[in-house]
Structure formats: structure tokens, C-alpha cells
Amino acid sequence: IRKSLVGSEMCIRDSGKALMLDGCWMTSLKDEKYYHECLVHPALSSIDEKSNVLIIGGGDGGTVRECVKYSQISKIDLVEIDEEVIKISKKFLKEIGGEAWNDKRLEIHVDDGVKWVKKTKDNFYDVIFIDCSDPSEFSNLLFSHSFYKECKRILSPRGILATQSESPESFKNIHINILKTLKNIFKVSETMYSFVPIYPSGIWSWTFASSEDLSLSKQNYDEVVKIEKGCEIWNLNFQNAAFKMMPNKIVKELDS
């Protein structure tokens, strides 16, 4: 167990390596691809131009690993508030980040994601991934209206914000608030659902938002074929189905 800025961290080995932060599961070797592939590929497989990417959180390296598969990415800024997460992941969870940590396009910044976004110039990033833990003292602002507005400001006109948007079961109110907030700020937003067995209730969500019409259904098919071969979970059919899985109780809440 290690103490860090945001709490106590533990790497568990007995039933497959996993990372726990203050009693909450963050990731595991067994389940992480359910999460990381769903966060990254719906956004990046729809982009065919040179792009700058920002990852807020993501200290385990999984989001970076999926991003570096795309040749059109010019730059990746990883902004992680807790350096210990990166150190622990590199030492004990090497299988997640792997060689992606050494990619020349990657720059690691130990910094507060909210402050980083505020000091970034307009229209700088083409894709922003919010790969953060559940709302807490240290991450609440990453779910706020003001933060999402700042993300919109620093995105290019056709840029995409991709965020984990919690469980519609275990964190229903937070989930609905995220969806309503993004819908209010961006022209379009779409949410997909899938399984992440290690997380509360086992069902999770990811939301994608843009100021232009999202092209998530208009993928670069050559890119899709190449990326699908390297994925364990994600493929285009999986994605298309996952975007149609919104529980009816969530639909009713959003329409009310």
C-alpha cells in the first residue's frame, strides 16, 4: 500500500493484478480492455486527420496504449494529478501501458487536469479523453459544467470530447447529470454502454460530445479493420450495438 496525493493505493496480485484506490477498484489486467477500448476507439476511429490528443487521468497507461495505435495522432498530452498511479502502473501493471509509455508522441505531465485545461489556448486539441476516477474531493471538478465548457473551448471546431460517464445503475444520478450537462454544452452527444466486470454493477458508460455532428457512425473503414485486429473487445458491430443500449429509465430521465 502506498500513500499519495489523492489517497491510498494498493496493487492486488492474488486474483490477477489490479489497482485499488482508497477501497475502490480502478483497473485490473483481466477487465481493463473492456474500459479502455470503449473509451478510445469510437472517437479515434472516426478521425482521419492529424490530431492532438489530451488525456486527463489515465495514469495506468491503458488509454495511451490504445491511442498510440493511430498513426494520425501527432501529439498526446497525458495529465495525471497523481504521480504514484503512474509509478505503480509502470512497476506492477506493465502489461497495461507496455511500450506505449515510450512512444515519442507522448508527454507526461503531473498536474491538475482542471488547471491544465484552463491554461490551454483555444482550439488546441482535436480529441480530449477524460479517464478519471469516480467523483471525489479530488475529481469532482472533472464532472462540472464549468470544466466541460472549458473543454469545449480548447477543442478544435470538429473536436470530440470522450469521457467515462459512470454506471447507470450504481451511480445513476451522477450518470444522468453528466449526460444532461454535456447535452446542454455541446451540439451533439452520444452515450454507449458495455460491461466492465470489476466496476460497481458491472455495467459502465462512455459519452462522446462535439460541437459539430459526430461522425462516430462514419468511421474510416481502413482504420477500423486495422484496429479491430488488435482489440479484444471493440469492433464496429460491438460499438454500434453499444450505442443502442441506453436503459429506458435513463431515456425517461433525460426526456423529463
Regions found by a protein language model. Give the residues of each.
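The AdoMet/dcAdoMet-binding core of the Class I SAM-like
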Residues: D31-I160, E169-I174
